[in-house]
Amino acid sequence: CFNPMIVELAEKAMKEYGEDPKIETNKFAAICTHLEVCFMYSDFHFIDERSESIIVESGDPNALLKHRFEIIEGRDRTMAWTVVNSICNTTGVEKPKFLPDLYDYKENRFIEIGVTRREVHTYYLEKANKIKSEKTHIHIFSFTGEEMATKADYTLDEESRARIKTRLFTIRQEMASRGLWDSFRQSERGEETIEEKFEITGTMRRLADQSLPPNFSSLENFRAYVDGFEPNGCIEGKLSQMSKEVNARIEPFLKTTPRPLRLPDGPPCSQRSKFLLMDALKLSIEDPSHEGEGIPLYDAIKCMKTFFGWKEPNIVKPHEKGINPNYLLAWKQVLAELQDIENEEKIPKTKNMKKTSQLKWALGENMAPEKVDFEDCKDVSDLRQYDSDEPESRSLASWIQSEFNKACELTDSSWIELDEIGEDVAPIEHIASMRRNYFTAEVSHCRATEYIMKGVYMNTALLNASCAAMDDFQLIPMISKCRTKEGRRKTNLYGFIIKGRSHLRNDTDVVNFVSMEFSLTDPRLEPHKWEKYCVLEIGDMLLRTAVGQVSRPMFLYVRTNGTSKIKMKWGMEMRRCLLQSLQQIESMIEAESSVKEKDMTKEFFENKSETWPIGESPKGVEEGSIGKVCRTLLAKSVFNSLYASPQLEGFSAESRKLLLIAQALRDNLEPGTFDLGGLYEAVEECLINDPWVLLNASWFNSFLAHALK
């Protein structure tokens, strides 16, 4: 029921404050109404050559008339302040603190127009309290035909005001006929009142004076300077006001401005996670009920016994830099020592490996440079930190996208129980527990959830062993537990790790370990992925397929690796990823619910026909079911944990700035930038060799390409 020009102005005003007219419909209607009243207030009112105020409804082209009212409302902020400033300069009227709506050339005063769905008196007082200016005239209209103005001076004649009241009544009727009036009437918020300046005295005052920026003598002096800051002057001016050294040219950011991120060249990047992901193979027992069930070593031996295809191991993909026979000997030693355990009367709860030469080599025993007390060497003239090589650039390889896709998939087992995501501390309100249950149902079978539980188990076991058996080369089975579709419990063994010496004093002190993990993946298919591994062939496994049983070689992926107390602490807390992705989903539900003005949790999860945007790929925006969205968000969170690195930290922080600028452009907010080149540099210096960061950068490029089409 508003004309297109008013609608357009209102949309622009809301976008300027980052609000969406489609979501905040009541606010949108209020802005349209207010604009229309301001325009009607000024319509037909002129000042003639004798400076008399007259009303002219039909245009007489030869009359020398000047508009009686200057319209300030409806202009963008910069323009509006320019108009206000020029009026103040030419008329000498005091400059208002807030942008008024109109200026009256006859009475020489600014006017603040209010349109309220509440009591006119209430609203009038709020307005007066907010603007605190004797000089600005206030005029309030209501939808019920009441009005109130400063000193009961209504500025306009009866007829002009009646026109406005009639229009407001019409708007109310139109809204009521569409069932919108009640919600509109109830949604009005009071004016935010700005508190009086309160005095700061005593200690706080001294602290305030001490903490001023340089060149300011007192708090008053600084306040005056800040108050003189035009809130909507151009940024260049502000910067030069702040410092003489800064000179920034604001460049408009257009669809053609951004270029794609430059991904590094070089050999393809390699796998660097602490354990195998999509390539892992499990030896499993169902419904475990053996003696000592739950003791990792007992479980591991039981799992090992389910496999009968062991054979003499041999190296199929050597590690470029390592002494490969040592990896082979290490595996043989594990098999032999497990055999020894079984020959004992009573199986021990933990197993410490013999400190053989192959294990000492693999675990870097005695490799650390000797530490010397600083007192003994501070006189050495050329004392310096030894040079470390720049990391070698690596290019994006396709395996990391495959890893991510696999992490989003469903497995045939459930990896968490319903109450895994946080226990109810208080009687949680019904909606929250309902959301949690829906979400858990979508992600409990997800492969990313398996990675969480595997990571939690491995880090907990390793941290325990690091503290409990500092000097020992302890054998730690890599285990996880799940439930089958039929609800039967299952214990899985992925392989083993052997921990090195672990006198961890600081959070960042490193404990070395050797990991040995089962797999059916032939490393020769993507040798670049396995650069850091030595891979052995250790057996043949019979697999049931559609065409009957086939035999596949079983591989063992062996590598040396390291971690620290702080990394293990975070690894133990990987369940947080479930919470993080649940919160992201909740904010999507909240957005839907606020549009529909009711809780949309049930519809959100149960409307199977609806698709949601998941991410960008070179093909465009990918869409999927709500379950797929849950699993994708979870997988992202899990990969951020599995592939955590300084490169990821830097890339996330810096690329976010670029993302916000691109989104502002998408929302037609006309963003401007300075030193965009510097921002690109900051993002690109994080693109070195990390597979997850490189994948995110390539996704980012897809986003840029589509967002700015």
Swiss-Prot record:
Biological processes, Gene Ontology terms: cap snatching; symbiont-mediated suppression of host gene expression; symbiont-mediated suppression of host mRNA transcription via inhibition of RNA polymerase II activity; viral RNA genome replication; viral translational frameshifting
UniProt-annotated location(s): Host cytoplasm; Host nucleus
Molecular function terms, GO-annotated: endonuclease activity; metal ion binding; RNA binding
Domain of life according to the entry: Viruses
EC number(s) recorded for this UniProt protein: 3.1.-.-
Residues reported in the UniProt entry to bind Mn(2+) 1: H34, D101, E112, I113
EC category: hydrolase
Residues reported in the UniProt entry to bind Mn(2+) 2: E73, D101
GO-annotated cellular components: host cell cytoplasm; host cell nucleus
Motif (Nuclear localization signal 2 (NLS2)): 177-240
Cofactor needs: Mn(2+)
Motif (Nuclear localization signal 1 (NLS1)) on chain: 117-132
UniProt remark on cofactor binding: Binds 2 manganese ions per subunit.
Post-translational modification comment from the UniProt entry: Phosphorylated on serines and threonines by host kinases, including human casein kinase II.
Keywords in alphabetical order: Cap snatching, Endonuclease, Eukaryotic host gene expression shutoff by virus, Eukaryotic host transcription shutoff by virus, Host cytoplasm, Host gene expression shutoff by virus, Host nucleus, Host-virus interaction, Hydrolase, Inhibition of host RNA polymerase II by virus, Manganese, Metal-binding, Nuclease, Phosphoprotein
Complexes and interactors: Influenza RNA polymerase is composed of three subunits: PB1, PB2 and PA. Interacts (via C-terminus) with PB1 (via N-terminus).
Purpose of the protein: Plays an essential role in viral RNA transcription and replication by forming the heterotrimeric polymerase complex together with PB1 and PB2 subunits. The complex transcribes viral mRNAs by using a unique mechanism called cap-snatching. It consists in the hijacking and cleavage of host capped pre-mRNAs. These short capped RNAs are then used as primers for viral mRNAs. The PB2 subunit is responsible for the binding of the 5' cap of cellular pre-mRNAs which are subsequently cleaved after 10-13 nucleotides by the PA subunit that carries the endonuclease activity.
Protein name from the UniProt record: Polymerase acidic protein
Organism: Influenza A virus (strain A/Teal/China/2978.1/2002 H5N1 genotype W)
Source lineage: Viruses, Riboviria, Orthornavirae, Negarnaviricota, Polyploviricotina
Encoding gene per record: PA
